[in-house]
Each structure stands twice: as C-alpha cells, then as structure tokens.
C-alpha cells in the first residue's frame, strides 16, 4: 500500500505555536524538521462525516484519540484552512469511522476535493439521526460535539460518544489502516 493521499490532517498538540511566515516556527525550530518528526509517528486513519444541512460533509483525519471512558469522550483536530471547517463548527453531531486496512480507497477519497467525497452513493447511507455513515467500516461512533477549542492553526474537537457500531464479519474485522511517512500500512504483530 503505497499511494499517497492528496491531504491528510496532521497531529497537533495544545502547546504547538502557530506557523510563522518563515521556514522557522516561532520557537526557532525548523518547520520542515517538525513536520518530518511528526511523519515518523504512525497514526490510525479515520474518516469524519456529518450533515451540514445542505448535504453530507466528510474528511480524512489521523488525529483521532480517546479522551475519557466515563463519560465516553473522543477527540480529533481539523485545520482552520480545511474546506470542512465551517460545517464542522456548525454541526451538533458527527460520525467517526475507524478505517480498516481494506479501506485505503476511502481514506484517499475523503482527502480529495470536497465535491468528490460523496459522489459514489453506493459507499454510504444516512443514519436515522441524519449523519452519513460509510459501509463496511470495522467500527464507527456517532458523536455529539461537546467542545470546539481553537489551538494554533487547528480546532480541537471533543465529542461525547452516543452510539458505537462494530462490524462482526471477517472482512470488516480486518486490521486497522495506518498512515506513516506518507504511506498507508497495516499493522503486523511482533514475534512472540
């Protein structure tokens, strides 16, 4: 699996400063070195979908994380320059899909131009609550948007999980899809 997506959200942390106009960040570190270090950290691949009121919106994100078990909270972040940012900020709920190794095509599709993401209607349906949901995803969670926190050049989204779905069939129970050094991977266990 070596195809590169057109765009994938990157990790940020609350103490990361905004990018300065020069190749150096405001802390004096080289922006290229910072990006290179982050590329070396593998991440699970998710697709976030929501209903904007005028149609479905979705994007690929690698910044997903669990935050709390009680209450069940999750997080991800989105760039302020994303074509999906305004719809996300207006959304009350969304669905986070944890992609399987067999779903690289979805990661790439939702990293493309917004008008192409939902073009193939055979790939998704609509939940009774209105959010688009992708077929064949090993796990997905319906999330109520709890907090939107501006952090540097991104917005950190904290969501309360209100519904969890896990597929039982063999294909959907496949290993998760990972993103590392600009490529997609499947995890393999170390020798035991």
Swiss-Prot record:
Bilayer-crossing regions: none
Keyword Phosphoprotein annotated: no
Binding site for FMN: 60-63, 77-84, 111, 117
E.C. number: 1.5.1.42
One Gene Ontology MF term: FMN binding
Residue segments, region Disordered: 1-20
SUPFAM superfamilies: FMN-binding split barrel
Catalytic activity: FMNH2 + NAD(+) = FMN + NADH + 2 H(+)
Disulfides per UniProt: none
Biotechnology: In association with the dszA-dszB-dsz operon can be used to remove sulfur from polycyclic aromatic sulfur compounds found in gasoline and diesel (biodesulfurization), which are a considerable source of pollution. In addition it may be possible to engineer the operon to make specialty chemicals. Can be engineered to make it more active, suggesting it may be possible increase the yield and rate of the biodesulfurization process.
InterPro entries according to UniProt: Flavin_Rdtase-like_dom (IPR002563), NADH-dep_flavin_reductase (IPR050268), Split_barrel_FMN-bd (IPR012349)
Gene Ontology terms: cellular component: cytoplasm
Main subcellular location: cytoplasm
Name of the featured protein: NADH:FMN oxidoreductase
Organism for this UniProt entry: Rhodococcus qingshengii
């Amino acid at each position: 699996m070596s195809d590169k997506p057109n765009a994938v959200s990157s990790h940020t942390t609350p103490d990361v400063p905004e990018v300065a106009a020069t190749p150096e960040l405001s802390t004096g570190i080289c922006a290229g070195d910072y990006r290179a270090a982050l590329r070396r950290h593998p991440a699970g691949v998710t697709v976030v979908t929501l209903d904007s009121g005028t149609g479905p919106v979705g994007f690929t994100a690698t910044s997903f994380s669990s935050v709390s078990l009680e209450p069940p909270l999750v997080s991800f972040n989105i760039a302020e320059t994303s074509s999906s940012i305004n719809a996300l900020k207006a959304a009350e709920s969304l669905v986070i899909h944890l992609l399987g190794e067999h779903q690289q095509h979805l990661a790439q599709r939702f990293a493309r131009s917004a008008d192409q993401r939902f073009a193939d209607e055979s790939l998704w349906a609509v939940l009774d609550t209105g959010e688009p949901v992708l077929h064949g995803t090993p796990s997905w969670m319906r999330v109520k948007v709890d907090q939107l926190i501006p952090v540097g050049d991104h917005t950190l989204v904290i969501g309360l999980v209100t519904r969890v779905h896990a597929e039982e069939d063999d294909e959907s129970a496949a290993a998760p899809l990972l993103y590392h050094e600009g490529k997609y991977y499947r995890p393999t266990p170390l020798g035991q």
